[in-house]
């Protein structure tokens, strides 16, 4: 794309485009943002815009398309959603006043992770930008991870030092679900992470150069942002990796944003052990924030619990659901706050009424910092400030320690409210384009300019009358023409009475015309009043935004407290509406639930009776409930409801039960349902086994594990053997609380064989060949699988089910008396597999698998095979 022989404007375009080759450049020309060449081709295709051409001084016309500047956000949103970056090039001066070429410059680069426009954001979901820095030290990988929401100013970071660092990174990405991820070059070798991002997220991945993570760059960036004593302030040790991730994120914001980086005032550090571990599979299976089918909110735990009044509360609720606590003290602080709000019905109602008038001040403050807030948005901040005394008072009145703490955290922001109320009219315009936002009496010059605009003739009449009185010239008059502007005309007979302060401008046959400094000043005011008024109002509004920006820390702290109060009040409201109870949460390791219900299904079945069920799990006699019963009887619902009840308790919510005692669980693992992973080339059985393997590797004695129909994707004996082995491994090596549903009735003998296993089944009532699911879980194994009866309920033709009964009777009659269910599993325990050669064990223990290259791993495998063959032959 040659830059010679082009018009000055296009030369300017090329110079700016050269600085932003990877972004689509929105180039402001008058009332449009125009795109040229490759940008135009891309935008016209993605946005379905008409592609035209522009004469740029060369022989060929430049491909061009454009969008109106007043509606550009809609088009920009579509491009950003498709993973493009957009550089906004603005006119930096009024074209009417420009001398020569209008000055233009990039004011922002908008990327998926740096969006602040409310029209492009979901009000109930954070929009995170992530930064990951990893480093290998002493033979082990470590990582620093940072997540920041530019639209709210929140920033969170953690240090990861897990044996499987890739899995740990995926867990954090799953927790925050960023829309854009900055990575360091070594991250390209973490195929599990890059595969997860590619297959399970829509995040844009931005590879940052090694230079972005240099020590000097990190130190300078952190000092500039947080002060020279940043390590002490933020609590980072000398060898911490988080600062590198934070600094890379901040530098990226400096590159893309002209303003607003100062919105990030601090970084909240957390340890991954602070929160319950929830794998991507578990989050999907439990349908916490979106359904598996349709990816909708309705039908999720978030849908059931969302009784919030503010956008800030909605985002925080989602965050709490995605990050359940594991500290019993912190959990009980939330529960006590919910109990206080639940009991104080009047205070709760008043609090929720006040919260209903609170706007999204987190995101409003960011737009104020960027200078892009509208007068109405600033007025909304003022209206929110006006509600803070009521919010603070009602929270304090409830008495719970956490509510008192949050009430104390609320700053009434009286000075901010005063500034807004003093400066802005009660009903400000949607934007500053036509002015009219500044309140009368706030600025004398604004008042004068408005008076001049609306009453300029009055000013002239008053001045004319005063001049007549001062000079004694009765017929002195003030006139106007396009050549001289305003002038004073005196007839020839009174020219001797004209004072020296009058300057003669024109001689007429009938008299003289004069001007005075005062008249010219008034002329300038009248003729330029509207333009100067707009400029002055813009300046005063900018000053107001600047004064509010100085209080961002106070506003942010208040917004955080208000959001927490909103969620807690919502929990109390949900408990009241849905008949929830306060759980007893401790570190006992016990999970005892009386008449538990599935929180989502009971809401979906409004008007129908949901059958409640009890659960008893502990670390001794009841570590594993082995659940049998027919398909469709409710096994999966029962298991999921227990997982959801535990999770609800640990976010501080009351739970759907008559009573609940929840010993804190550090993680919930689920293996339910069956599906192929076609993208990864894995069969249903392979997916199932991979997920089970991850559970067995990562579960601890404090975890809750949900396993549904393990082994059904292969042959009966293979599946049964795998299921039995999994149960044994969990009970003997992990000891965690487990709900294990199976269609292998032969496994029910494990109650006698393995300590901690208890048989339960879903009760079924049978009449003839018809069955009724009672949905009630009872002790003991199921007496039948009822497969044919379920097939009949599903609608199989009667001829098919009748024939199935005939075949079943034939098979049962011909089966040996020693049925599969009577298999001697004890005999399996007596079978000893050949011992692994000690030489092989020594080699395996000595090798560091993570340091091997693919070739080294292959050679090592051949060496092991050779050792094994020699041992067997020997």
What function would you assign to each model-found segment?
Residues 173, 178-186, 518-551, 628, ...:
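Conserved catalytic alpha/beta cores of large enzymes that bind or transform nucleotide phosphates
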Residues 37-40, 239, 309-310, 317-320, ...:
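ATPase nucleotide-binding head domains, primarily ABC-like/P-loop NTPase cores
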Residues 210-225, 276-282, 292, 383-462, ...:
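Amphipathic heptad-repeat alpha-helical coiled-coil/stalk segments that mediate oligomerization
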Residues 6-10, 26, 37, 66-76, ...:
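Amphipathic alpha-helical transducer elements in NTP-driven molecular machines
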Residues 481, 845-874:
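Terminal-proximal interaction/regulatory segments of ATP-powered molecular machines
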Residues 2-340, 349, 353-369, 373-465, ...:
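Charged catalytic and DNA/RNA-contacting regions of genome-maintenance
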Residues 370, 374, 387, 405, ...:
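Charged, surface-exposed helical/loop "interaction arms" that form contiguous linear patches used
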Residues 112-121, 260, 396-402, 461-473, ...:
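Active-site phosphate-binding and catalytic loops of NTP-dependent enzymes
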